[in-house]
């Protein structure tokens, strides 16, 4: 019976939806989500991994000009990796930034943390996403595994009204449970992708493994 439950859980979780690096045109990878979940650090982890291990030509764009030192943080990562960074202050700035980075395979777009309760801020995210055609972009909603489940539900549902997305969960090192990850995945139908468990760049990140999660859900060791 336990094995059957394990099999069902694995099938429901499915395979992680990772960034597709097989692209002929520049692809834009947007990272959206509330404040304080680790979007910028997650971008640095993924960008550095692809840059160093896959030799992917990557670049960065940030629209997070609201948070103190946010641009400087991403600029530091860009300098270390030797990759370009464009700063945009409005959706209108995206076109010239995209023209500057048209020779790159992947462009990671860091967005400002937004309140899911603020209509104007939701529209800001929508307008930014609309600057890139669906065929040329992927969107990742970054959530913290430590956030209360009730709040996760509200956040995920609100962003579902804006766009389709894949799920990234951060701060797994700060919690013992993974039930909220599974439940949000089932609630939204959004594919799971990456998980992070620390601040080290480019380490402490990996794909969400269905077998490991199923074992944890059933009370076993991962």
Regions found by a protein language model. Give the residues of each.
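C-terminal-of-GTPase-core extension/linker across diverse P-loop GTPases
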Residues: 3-33, 37, 90, 100-105, ...
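Conserved catalytic network of the ASCE P-loop NTPase/AAA+ motor domain
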Residues: 23, 51-54, 78-81, 99-104, ...
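Short acidic loop-to-helix transition motifs that present clustered carboxylates
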Residues: 66-68, 90-94, 148
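Primarily NTPase-proximal linker/entry elements flanking Walker-type ATP/GTP-binding cores
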Residues: 1-58, 62-65, 76-77, 81-83, ...
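Conserved beta-strand/loop subsegment of P-loop NTPase cores
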Residues: 57-59, 109, 134-143, 160-182, ...
């Amino acid at each position: 019976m336990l094995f059957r439950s394990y099999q069902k859980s694995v099938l429901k979780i499915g395979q992680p939806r990772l960034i597709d690096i097989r692209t002929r045109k520049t692809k834009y990878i947007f990272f959206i989500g509330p404040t304080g979940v680790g979007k910028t650090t997650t971008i640095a982890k993924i960008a550095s991994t692809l840059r160093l291990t896959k030799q992917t030509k990557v670049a960065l764009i940030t629209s997070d000009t609201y948070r103190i030192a946010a641009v400087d943080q991403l600029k530091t990562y860009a300098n270390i990796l030797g990759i370009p960074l464009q700063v945009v202050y409005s959706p209108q700035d995206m076109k010239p930034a995209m023209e500057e980075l048209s020779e790159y395979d992947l462009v990671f777009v860091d967005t400002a943390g937004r309140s899911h309760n603020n209509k104007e801020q939701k529209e800001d995210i929508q307008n930014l996403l609309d600057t890139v055609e669906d065929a040329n972009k992927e969107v990742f909603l970054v959530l913290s595994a430590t956030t209360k489940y009730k709040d996760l539900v509200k956040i995920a549902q609100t962003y579902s009204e804006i766009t389709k997305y894949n799920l990234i969960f951060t701060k797994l090192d700060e919690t013992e449970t993974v039930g909220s990850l599974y439940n949000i995945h089932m609630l939204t139908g959004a594919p799971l992708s990456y998980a992070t468990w620390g601040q080290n760049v480019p380490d402490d990140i990996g794909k969400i493994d269905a077998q490991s999660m199923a074992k944890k859900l059933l009370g076993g060791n991962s």
